[in-house]
Amino acid sequence: MQELAIYGGTRVIQPEEVRSWPPVDKSDEELVLDALYAKNQTRGKHNLELEKEFAAWNGNSHALFTNSGTAALHMCIAGCGIGAGDHVLVTAYSWSSSATCILHHDALPIFIDIDFDTFLIDPDKIEAAITPRTRAIIVVQLHGLCADMDAVNAIAAKHNLYVIEDACQAHGATYKGR
C-alpha cells in the first residue's frame, strides 16, 4: 500500500493546482475595509444594497439580513408571539437551531417525521401532531428542495397556525415555478 502524501508519499495534486475560493481582489479588500470603518456596520450601505438585491432575486419586496439563520428563526418565533407553553411543529432532520430557537422562547418543539423521498417535512404527518397549544409550523427547506407548501399552508390555514420557512439551506430553490 502506498504511503499517504501527508506522511511523505507522492502527492496527487500539486500545490500550484490548488486554487483558493472565492478569489479575492483589491476591490474586495476595499469593500471590506469600507464596511469595517463605517459608522453603522449593521445597517450600513452595503447591507442595505445586499438586502435589496437579495429581495429582488427572490421576487420579494423586502429582505432583512441577520448574522445567522438561528437569529432569523428567533426573530420569526418572537414576531409570531410564540412563548411559554406554546407548541411549534418542526422536523428533527435539520440544524439544531430549528428546534432550539423554540425552546429559547419557552415553547415546546413537537417533532414531525420527514418524507423519506425528500427529507423534508411530511404534510401527511402534521395534523396528527396539532394540539390546542400549537401555534406554528417551521418548515425546513433542505438540499435546495422545497416541501409541499400547498399542503402545509392548507393545514396551517385550517388550524390558524403560522408557517415559518427556514430556507437557510435552500437559497434559490423553487416551488411550482416560483
Q: Model-found features: residue ranges?
A:
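Active-site-adjacent capping/gating segments
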Residues: A170, G177-R178
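Compositionally biased, intrinsically disordered low-complexity segments enriched
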Residues: A5, R43, H143-L145, H171
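Conserved PLP-binding active-site segment in aminotransferase class I/II-type PLP enzymes
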Residues: M1-G79, G83, D150, A157
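PLP-dependent aminotransferase-like
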Residues: A78-A167, T174
